[in-house]
Amino acid sequence: MSTALAHSTLISDFSEICDVKPPYRIIIEHINHNPHGKDVSDKLNEEFVVLENEGAEKISLAGWTLTDDTTTGVRRHVYTFPQTVSLSSREKAYIHTGPGEDSFEEGKPSKWNLHWERHSFVWNNEGDTATLFDAEGNKVDSLQVVTLKAT
């Protein structure tokens, strides 16, 4: 076992003993990066990202950001969450690429429908990476999707 692995294991074991939990349990659940059919402007809202609060605590997303591929260090497209958005346990947020009116739907689970207000697609059809940052710029989660081509 390497030193780095042993150190990581020690910290993990310590966290379980002390019942230390990560500050956020917001995950990027899904990226609908390649809606069926041609990429035409009336399909912008069929391209979306889904976040979910897997934790027990309500989390405010005010000032949080969602970006596409950050592997180059440059955030090409950045969505900033409005001050009014928070997710209770198991609630979801759908961030649609196109224009529209933001809304909240009660249900099981309840969900936000948020709109990036873009007039062109964000997520690459071949695949892309979505990264979520909190208001202080700390990386919260990241999800990469790849489109497999039939041979």
Show where each model-derived region lies.
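Short, surface-exposed beta-strand/loop "edge" segments at domain boundaries and coil↔beta transitions
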Residues: 73-75, 103, 137-141
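A broad, low-specificity signal marking well-ordered, structured residues that form hydrophobic/aromatic
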Residues: 26, 64, 79, 93, ...
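The feature marks short-to-medium sequence segments in extracytoplasmic or secretory-pathway proteins
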Residues: 55-89
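A structural motif detector for short, solvent-exposed N-terminal "entry" segments of globular domains
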Residues: 4-69, 118-127, 135-136, 140-151
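Residue-level detector of flexible, active-site-proximal loop/helix-junction positions
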Residues: 35, 73, 85, 100, ...
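Intrinsically disordered, low-complexity Pro/Gly/Ser/Thr-rich segments with frequent PxxP/GP/PP motifs
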Residues: 76-116
